[in-house]
Structure formats: C-alpha cells, structure tokens
Amino acid sequence: MVARTPQKQRKVAMVVPPLNSDLLKETINKVDKCMERLQELQYTIAGGTKVVSGVNLSPRSTRIYLKTSLRCKQETLRIKNATNKKSPVGKFPASSPGDWRKMSLPAMLLGETVNEILQASQVTRDIVDAIAPKKSRKSRRLTMSQEDDGPKTPETQQKSREQNPETVSSNIKARRKKEKQNRRSESDSPPSLQRARSRIAFRTISPQVKGNNGENSFRHLANRVSPKHKPWVKKAVLFPNPLFISGTATQQAKFSRTMSPVIARNEISSIKNNKETPYKFLIKSPPTSASKFQVKIRSPPKVLVSPTRNGSNSVRKSPRGSRSPTRTVNLGKKSASISPIRNTGKRSPKLSTAAKLRRSFTPTRNGSNLARKSSISPKRVTLQAFLSPTRNGNFCKKSPKASISPTRVCNKSQKLSTAAKFRRSFSPSRLAMRFVSPMKSRKV
C-alpha cells in the first residue's frame, strides 16, 4: 500500500506559490554583504580612508564619476523646473529639500541605493516568513540565531549517547593498570633486548664490499675529496702576508716597494743589525765625465771650513800659490789639484744648503772672499803650491806627492752646488776681485 497525504494538506500545497525559501535566504545574505560594501564606499566618499578590496577609493578615480556628475546636473535642472517640489517617499525628507545639493553627487547616489536595498531586503524577509512552514518556537530561535551569526553546522545527536564521566575515568584506570603489567613483564627479560628495540638498526655491510672499496677508494673519492681531508695540500690565500713567506730578500723588497702596509721581515732585521741608511737616502757618486752644471753630491761631507778661518788661512798664504778648480798639473805620473775652498784639515759641523746661501751674503763672508780670492787665480797653478805643504795648510800632513783631485781633498771635501756658484759670481766683492786677480796671476 502506498501512503497518501490527506486532502487538507494537498489543498494548502496547491494554494502556496512555488517559491524556494532557501534561495530567498541566500539572496538576503548577498544583499546584506552588498550593503556593507556600499557603506564602506559611502564612508570613503564622505572623506574617510576606508579601503574596499585593497584599493583606495576616491570620488574622481573612476570614469563613472563624470557620468554621474552629468546626471546630477540634469537632475537638478529637472527638479527646479518641476511643479511638485516634494521629494518621493523613502528619499530625503520634505523639510530639507535642498540639503542633498550641498553633498557630493556620489554620496547622494549611494544614500539612495542603500535605502532601496534596505527596503528590498525587508520585503524579502517578510515573504520568507510567510512562505516558510510553521515550526516550533525552538527551531525558529535556532534559525534566527543562524541568520544573525551566519550559517552553522547542525549539532550532532551523538552527545546524548555520551558516557558518564565515572565510566570514562574507570576506563582510563583500567588502561593504566594494563600498561603497568606489560612493563613489569618486560623488565623480567634482559635489559639489552629492551634497549635494542628502541635503537636504530643500521644496515650491515658485507666484508666483500668493504674489501673492494678499500682497494679502489682513491679512484672512487677522486672527485669528492674536500680540502679538509687533504692536510698535505697548502691552502690558497688570496692576499698573502710577506711576513710569513720564507722567500728571498729581493722578493720581499719588491713587496715593500708597493704601497701595501706590510713591512718585510728581513728588512727590519737588516736595519736593526747594520744600522745603515736605506736605499732611498743613499747618495750616489757623480760620473767621471760630469759637466759643470750636473753636480751631484757623492757622500755626506764630514769636513767643512768656516769662512773666518778660511779667510785667515788664505791671507797667510803666498799669492803665488794659485789654485784652479778646473786644471790639474802632472807631477811625475800623478796629478795634483786642490779644490778652491775646502783646503784645511779642520772640521766643522754639517751645513745645509739654505745656511750656505745665507752665509754667502754676510759682510764677514765678503771680507774673507776678498782676502782669499786675492791669492787665487782661476787660470794657473804653480808648482810651489803643491811642493810646499806648509803654505797649503798641511793638507792631512802628507807628502807633496800625494795626488789631490778636485773632487776629493782627503775624502772630506764637498762640491759646491751650481746654484751657489752662480749666486757667488754676481756678488760685488767677487766682481771687484775678477778685475784684480788676472793681473796677479800674470805676475807669477
């Protein structure tokens, strides 16, 4: 037998229109979401900073703004010309008909749309309440709470079948007793087996494989050896420190010539032991064929003559003993000449070039120059000057045969610089003596 519905219920079903209440509920939820978004838009247009779907909204950022502004102008003209000045029901109240003009156009449009959506949602809710079958009050409350808070999963009926807490606790106690009994039985067995169960079982390697690997280990590991496994290989250093390199002195000298802030080890030891002047301050001897204007200092002078003493010595000497700095006279097989200024064995402290230039213009210096140059001729050298050691101021107390070169006088003389010679040649005392000295030298 097929069960049939009673006639009363059949009539009611035929009268009710075919509307799906679930579909209407979904539409209401969608309308509510649209309302939230429109409220955000309204807040943004009114001057707020709300963001909708990650985009900052401003009234003039869209193309629709221009279209709606044009529509707003048309609407204002239509309202002015219309006879009926009352606003429609559901829009702005009649008491303030011109207030909306003060607002911006998008704000006005949004306000109208929000009101319309609210009305539509209310109508649909009324329809749903009328169409839905009458249920108990409890079910209505559940549906209302679901609509307010959103959809929820229905509660399962298994909660009614839950065991009492006393039975749950008794089950837990029974389980613990069983575990304790199992542990006691395991403790009777040897502990090594118990530990081995918890350990990791490593895979054993057969001895044949081990032997093969031992024979050809270098071949297999050739491409995979890291530098820490090769201690015999020197590490590559990008910027080596020459202090820790055991190389020759020339290699380390090359390093020090560069501008690196590293001091060579051998150079430090050599400077400490020898205490010699470094190569930068070595004074090289001039070449043998050096011209007059290419004068180089050969070595730091150790013997200098003070001007006053030099002048007194030159006064005592005979005018016949003339000395020229350019000519030499052969005495037997050896050449002998005397440099013009440095002709005494007495020593004086070392003088700088600036001090020499200052002294050349002092009055005492000029006087000594007059006295000295009266007895010196630049052209001839007599034999008496070389044969009489007493007149020459006892040059190192040596025999007259000792050769005296213009560059060396007992290895304690020093050449004048070219600049000093030129300055001295233009002094008034020197010019005066230029006229006198040739006559004296001719008399000899």
From Swiss-Prot:
<protein>
    <recommendedName>
        <fullName>Probable microtubule-binding protein TANGLED</fullName>
    </recommendedName>
</protein>
<feature type="region of interest" description="Disordered">
    <location>
        <begin position="290"/>
        <end position="354"/>
    </location>
</feature>
<keyword id="KW-0539">Nucleus</keyword>
<feature type="region of interest" description="Disordered">
    <location>
        <begin position="131"/>
        <end position="218"/>
    </location>
</feature>
<dbReference type="GO" id="GO:0008017">
    <property type="term" value="F:microtubule binding"/>
</dbReference>
<dbReference type="GO" id="GO:0009524">
    <property type="term" value="C:phragmoplast"/>
</dbReference>
<dbReference type="GO" id="GO:0005829">
    <property type="term" value="C:cytosol"/>
</dbReference>
<feature type="compositionally biased region" description="Polar residues">
    <location>
        <begin position="205"/>
        <end position="216"/>
    </location>
</feature>
<dbReference type="GO" id="GO:2000694">
    <property type="term" value="P:regulation of phragmoplast microtubule organization"/>
</dbReference>
<dbReference type="GO" id="GO:0000914">
    <property type="term" value="P:phragmoplast assembly"/>
</dbReference>
<feature type="compositionally biased region" description="Polar residues">
    <location>
        <begin position="307"/>
        <end position="329"/>
    </location>
</feature>
<dbReference type="GO" id="GO:0005875">
    <property type="term" value="C:microtubule associated complex"/>
</dbReference>
<comment type="function">
    <text>Is required for spatial control cell division during plant development. Through an association with microtubules, acts both for the positioning of cytoskeletal arrays that establish planes of cell division during prophase and for spatial guidance of expanding phragmoplasts toward preestablished cortical division sites (CDS) during cytokinesis.</text>
</comment>
<dbReference type="GO" id="GO:0005730">
    <property type="term" value="C:nucleolus"/>
</dbReference>
<dbReference type="GO" id="GO:0009574">
    <property type="term" value="C:preprophase band"/>
</dbReference>
<dbReference type="InterPro" id="IPR044709">
    <property type="entry name" value="TAN1"/>
</dbReference>
<keyword id="KW-0206">Cytoskeleton</keyword>
<keyword id="KW-0963">Cytoplasm</keyword>
<comment type="subunit">
    <text>Interacts with POK1.</text>
</comment>
<feature type="region of interest" description="Disordered">
    <location>
        <begin position="390"/>
        <end position="409"/>
    </location>
</feature>
